[in-house]
């Protein structure tokens, strides 16, 4: 059974592809056509008439926003339940400093929104929600303070009529927190500069508008206590799209809030349904939850070199955390997935140190780097949502990530096996949040996202006190000299970086957070959008398999010196012509691996790189264009090589070479390995360089390439399309070899239009030229073009040359083969 037959048999798992029909596809129903259709249509059947509502899908524009939102005008379209107009942070006992222009603009905006049925919300959030505080207003003829309060408080201005303020508030007494802002903005009998507002603790003041309506908590007639108070009437218009809250509903919410009050008066909201609106099949739901966010940050390091004393790879893992906690007397099963994207390194990578000494660099979570945490629960509204928006949270806390130097995960093979290091410290702060897709061991679907930014200072080398010096990370050395200067400072090395190093074990963090968001859900609970119904654990198992495979490849690559790799390549080619025939039971395994790989391809960043471009498939009754990067498998399926490429390794031999070397974690032996499904699937989806005569490339694509490289292409040329380095190389009939860097999508487009006439190669044209030059320095001079191609594209003759290569040529050969292997398996 050949490799081509095996892979073609096992590739088509649950889909139909069309590789020859490469024309542009158009949908028979456009968005404009749907918009032009009437909302109701009448059809007659004899004497009977039937009325149908237009059930074509409605397009919803969603966004992921930061909270609080910036001050400024917002869209007036009715596609948002609530959004902010103004926000400001205030220190304790400091006037809000609202200028006349800002106050007038706010008043104008609020008046316009009231004409559309909105209400204004005045929300006060103290920085320390366990600290008691009061709000106060003072002017020439009116002074008042709220009662002592704790936590977040809000007041909704339902309307102003006949100098009476109709207010819904989270506080039952008059005046409530928020009334001071209402009075400052809407009073007409006093100048803005003569009215002052302050709070006894640091707070954030937010003014927003909402479509929801609330029953009045109280009606405040200030003239009863303070005569001559003047307000202009402000009455919201009644619209059919308003979301109504009756007294019973608000009372129920208040009873729930009061039941959660602690003895010290701190309000803990576990989960409140703020608003709900139904329209046909769908409903819009706004909810508030108190969640426990628990996540981990875990690093890794890989040692390599001849004796395993060099740190050749490091970084942070994607950490999945499954945990339980109590909310409202119920056990909540939650999952978080945390990932760190470091951008800087510390340490020194210097091969001149020798194989017996430590050398290497460690990735560092440093200034402006991002930590992203995805959160989901086993049962909640978001899991069955079509989309979500208006994410908000009260989390403002900073936290520090650090470790002990003796926790370093990597060791050398030289006594005493330890490596000097300083873990450093990273100060993290909540940046913004929103929504995203998550793929965990037991859930696939929508999740909340929390993004934390490292706010540690970006400091250069120099003299610092010890506390500051300990915030620098380093490996191979401590971050600073042991000797203390006379002024009490220490010299920090230039190989150090402020932040937290990656080669340390898992550190866990846990915080209580309030979140609010709006979702679109099916109004009938019998309808489902999937949620956990399609959450397959196979994706997690497959990811773990890929990680294990990557670790094996890293270990194999790092433990091979140049001669090992070169001899390993030679050993591989010695068995390349004998493709492993041990295929008992492999078809089912390969089919499962191929199917699972498709499910996660492009979805999880560290499992498989997202493939580019389009691919043409038939889905139901429509042609869908999903062009992707052409793979090794595509070449196998359409392999019809011209005679000029006949002496290159065929597909079976090339595949066997990659598979055999990838299957070993030490120096390559001469025996044949059993075929491994995961490795087979990855190599089948890899992209080794493509070598083809110019005649195999369509005329239109040759013209496109000519424009890119600004030169005409000789029709007798041999061309190489390298998807590893994103380059095109051309060897023309004058025996001139030129290489051009191009956009990867250009290569994809060329290969997608190429039907056969090419071969996947283990080596580039550049390395082939170097191999030939090693034994025949004047080969490009003395041979004519036809004979030169015969030697340059003869894999077996080139491999015989490798035993006579210089150290530099061996290094180039090994480096290219290593890059090719990483491309196939990483």
UniProtKB/Swiss-Prot annotation:
The record marks 249-250, 262-263 as: Probable cleavage. Pfam families: Rota_VP4_MID. GO terms for biological process: permeabilization of host organelle membrane involved in viral entry into host cell; virion attachment to host cell. Keywords: Capsid protein, Hemagglutinin, Host cell membrane, Host endoplasmic reticulum, Host membrane, Host-virus interaction, Membrane, Outer capsid protein, Viral attachment to host cell, Viral penetration into host cytoplasm, Viral penetration via permeabilization of host membrane, Virion, Virus entry into host cell. One of its GO terms (cellular component) is viral outer capsid. Coiled coil: none annotated. InterPro entries: Rota_A_VP4, Rota_VP4_MID, Rota_VP4_MID_sf. Belongs to the rotavirus VP4 family. This is Outer capsid protein VP4. The lineage of its organism: Viruses, Riboviria, Orthornavirae, Duplornaviricota, Resentoviricetes.
């Amino acid at each position: 059974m050949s490799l081509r037959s095996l892979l073609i048999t096992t590739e088509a798992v649950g889909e139909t592809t069309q590789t020859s029909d490469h024309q542009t596809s158009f949908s028979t129903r456009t968005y404009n056509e749907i918009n032009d259709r009437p909302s109701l249509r009448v059809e007659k059947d004899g004497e009977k008439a039937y009325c149908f509502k237009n059930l074509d899908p409605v397009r919803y524009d969603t966004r992921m926003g930061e909270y609080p939102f910036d001050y400024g005008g917002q869209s007036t379209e009715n596609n948002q339940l609530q959004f902010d107009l103004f926000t400001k942070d205030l220190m304790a006992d400091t006037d809000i400093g609202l200028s006349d222009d800002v106050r007038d603009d706010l008043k104008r905006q609020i008046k316009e929104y009231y004409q559309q049925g909105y209400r204004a919300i005045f929300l006060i959030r103290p920085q320390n929600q366990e600290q008691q505080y009061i709000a106060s207003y003072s002017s020439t003829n009116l002074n008042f303070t709220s009662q002592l309060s704790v936590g977040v408080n809000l007041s909704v201005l339902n309307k102003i009529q006949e100098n009476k303020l109709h207010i819904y508030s989270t506080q039952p007494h008059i005046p409530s927190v928020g009334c001071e802002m209402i009075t400052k903005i809407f009073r007409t009998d006093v100048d803005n500069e003569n009215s002052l507002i302050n709070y006894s603790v640091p707070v954030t003041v937010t003014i927003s508008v909402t479509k929801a309506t609330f029953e009045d908590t109280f009606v405040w007639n200030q003239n009863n206590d303070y005569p001559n108070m003047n307000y202009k009437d402000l009455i919201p218009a009644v619209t059919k799209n308003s979301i109504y809250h009756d007294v019973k509903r608000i009372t129920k919410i208040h009873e729930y809030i009061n039941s959660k009050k602690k003895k010290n008066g701190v309000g803990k909201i576990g989960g409140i349904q703020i608003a709900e609106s139904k329209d046909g099949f769908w409903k819009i739901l706004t909810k508030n939850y108190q969640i426990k966010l628990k996540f981990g940050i875990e690093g890794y390091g890989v040692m390599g070199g001849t004796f395993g004393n060099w740190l050749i790879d490091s970084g942070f893992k994607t950490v999945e955390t499954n945990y339980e906690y109590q909310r409202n007397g119920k056990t909540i099963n939650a999952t978080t997935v945390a990932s760190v994207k470091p951008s800087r390194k510390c340490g020194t990578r210097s091969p001149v140190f020798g194989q017996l000494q430590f050398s290497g660099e460690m990735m560092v979570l440093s200034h402006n780097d991002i930590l992203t945490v995805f959160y989901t629960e086993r049962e909640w509204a978001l899991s069955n949502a079509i989309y979500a928006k208006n994410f908000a949270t009260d989390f403002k806390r900073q936290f520090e990530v650090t470790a002990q130097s003796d926790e370093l995960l990597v060791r050398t093979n030289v006594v005493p096996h330890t490596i000097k290091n300083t873990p450093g410290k990273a100060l993290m702060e909540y940046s913004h949040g929103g929504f995203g897709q998550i793929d965990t061991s037991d859930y696939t679907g929508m999740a909340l996202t929390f993004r934390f930014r490292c706010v540690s200072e970006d400091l250069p080398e120099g003299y610092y006190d010890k506390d500051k010096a300990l915030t620098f990370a380093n490996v191979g050395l401590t971050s600073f000299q042991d000797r203390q200067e006379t002024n009490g400072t220490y010299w920090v090395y230039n190989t150090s970086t402020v932040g937290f190093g990656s080669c340390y074990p898992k550190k866990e963090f846990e915080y209580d957070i309030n979140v609010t968001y709006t979702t679109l859900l099916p109004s009938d609970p019998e309808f489902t959008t999937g949620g956990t119904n399609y959450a397959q654990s196979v994706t997690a198992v497959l990811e773990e398999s890929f990680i294990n495979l990557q670790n094996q490849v890293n270990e194999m690559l790092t433990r091979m010196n140049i001669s090992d790799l070169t001899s390993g390549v030679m050993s591989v080619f010695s068995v390349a012509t004998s493709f492993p025939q041990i295929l008992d039971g492999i078809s089912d395994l390969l089919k499962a691996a191929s199917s699972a790989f498709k499910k996660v391809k492009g979805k999880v960043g560290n499992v498989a790189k997202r493939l580019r471009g389009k691919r043409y498939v038939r889905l139901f009754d429509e042609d869908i264009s999903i062009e992707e990067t052409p793979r090794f498998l595509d070449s196998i399926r359409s392999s019809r090589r011209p005679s000029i490429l006949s002496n290159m390794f065929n597909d079976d031999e090339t595949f066997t070479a990659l598979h055999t070397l990838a299957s070993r974690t030490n120096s390559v032996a001469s025996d044949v390995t059993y075929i491994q499904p995961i490795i087979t699937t990855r190599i089948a989806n890899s992209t080794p360089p493509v070598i083809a005569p110019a005649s195999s490339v369509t005329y239109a694509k040759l013209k496109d390439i000519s424009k890119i490289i600004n030169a005409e292409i000789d029709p007798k040329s041999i061309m190489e399309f390298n998807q590893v380095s994103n380059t095109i190389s051309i060897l023309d009939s004058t025996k001139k070899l030129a290489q051009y860097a191009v956009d990867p999508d250009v290569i994809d487009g060329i290969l997608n239009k190429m039907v056969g006439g090419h071969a996947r190669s283990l080596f580039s044209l550049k390395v082939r030229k170097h191999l030939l030059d090693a034994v025949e320095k004047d080969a490009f001079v003395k041979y004519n073009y036809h004979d030169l191609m015969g030697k340059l594209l003869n894999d077996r003759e080139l491999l015989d040359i490798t035993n006579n290569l210089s150290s530099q040529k061996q290094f180039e050969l090994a480096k290219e083969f290593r890059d090719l292997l990483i491309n196939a398996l990483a």
